[in-house]
Amino acid sequence: MSENTSPSIAAVRDLREASCSPIGAPTVTNDLSENVILTSLDDLHNWARLSSLWPLLYGTACCFIEFAALLGSRFDFDRFGLVPRSSPRQADLLIVAGTVTMKMAPALVRLYEQMPEPKYVIAMGACTITGGMFSADSTTAVRGVDKLIPVDLYLPGCPPRPEAIFDAVIKLRKKVGDESLAERRKHQQTHRYVTVSHQMKRVEPVVNGSYLRAESQKAALAAAPAGQTLATDAAVLTPAAEPLES
């Protein structure tokens, strides 16, 4: 081939080097490069918020004792930037730990309404999430705090260990880091929760001593052999104490 139609080896080498690194080396000095950060507004805003969550501690029962263990030197609660606040107007994270009763429900809702946006809620413990062991017999326990305020993260356990609380905080930090300012403004009005004037529905008391006459007892009577009856008196069900031998 002629020289006009076939490029030289040196020209091909120069073209390959130019295509592999089409942009030259930056002219920014080392001192200046360590002081310049290229980021977006969402990333900068989310990084500042997830690194300095200020919780409002709402502890009503034994779950809060596990949370109090985080304040010691063994778990180092402050390394996540969490600074407990005593005023809801200075907090952006509400940690509900323990049973929520009908009488305390308006106070909890008022605390949530006084917190500035954006705000988050962690439901800690079985009693907070579903009512726990008080959901069957108690007439004053709220069956889930999400019936009062929106919950961002559920932390099951009875009670949860301090390591589980750390895991919940880490997951909440990831959620905060993935948020967008534009999307949060769109979905902010979709969060619905009751107000302090909400009338709680009360149920009939079930602690009346009639457990032996419940549906489960009726099923046991139906399954019993013919001619055999089950005792329905608590005194009969309680075994008598055996006499002591002298």
Curated annotation (Swiss-Prot):
Membrane-topology descriptor: Peripheral membrane protein
Question: What are the UniProt keywords, alphabetically?
Answer: 4Fe-4S, Iron, Iron-sulfur, Membrane, Metal-binding, NAD, NADP, Plastoquinone, Quinone, Thylakoid, Translocase, Transport
Q: GO CC annotations?
A: plasma membrane-derived thylakoid membrane; respiratory chain complex I
Q: One Pfam family this chain carries?
A: Oxidored_q6
Q: Which residues form a coiled coil?
A: none
Please verify whether the record's keywords include Transmembrane helix: no
Locations listed in the record: Cellular thylakoid membrane
Give start-end of the signal peptide: none
Q: List the InterPro entries.
A: NADH_UbQ_OxRdtase-like_20kDa, NADH_UQ_OxRdtase_20Kd_su
Q: What is its main location?
A: membrane
Task: Please provide the Gene Ontology terms (biological process) for this protein.
Answer: aerobic respiration; electron transport coupled proton transport; photosynthesis, light reaction
Can you tell me which residues bind [4Fe-4S] cluster? Answer: C62, C63, C127, C158
Cofactor binding, note field: Binds 1 [4Fe-4S] cluster.
Q: Name one GO molecular function term.
A: NADH dehydrogenase (ubiquinone) activity
The record's EC number reads 7.1.1.-
> Among its keywords, does the record have Iron-sulfur?
yes
Cofactor(s) named in the record:
[4Fe-4S] cluster
Family, as annotated: Belongs to the complex I 20 kDa subunit family.
What is its quaternary makeup?
NDH-1 can be composed of about 15 different subunits; different subcomplexes with different compositions have been identified which probably have different functions.
Q: NCBIfam families of this UniProt entry?
A: nuoB_fam, PRK06411.1
**Protein's job:** NDH-1 shuttles electrons from an unknown electron donor, via FMN and iron-sulfur (Fe-S) centers, to quinones in the respiratory and/or the photosynthetic chain. The immediate electron acceptor for the enzyme in this species is believed to be plastoquinone. Couples the redox reaction to proton translocation, and thus conserves the redox energy in a proton gradient. Cyanobacterial NDH-1 also plays a role in inorganic carbon-concentration.
Q: What name does UniProt use for this protein?
A: NAD(P)H-quinone oxidoreductase subunit K
Gene name? ndhK
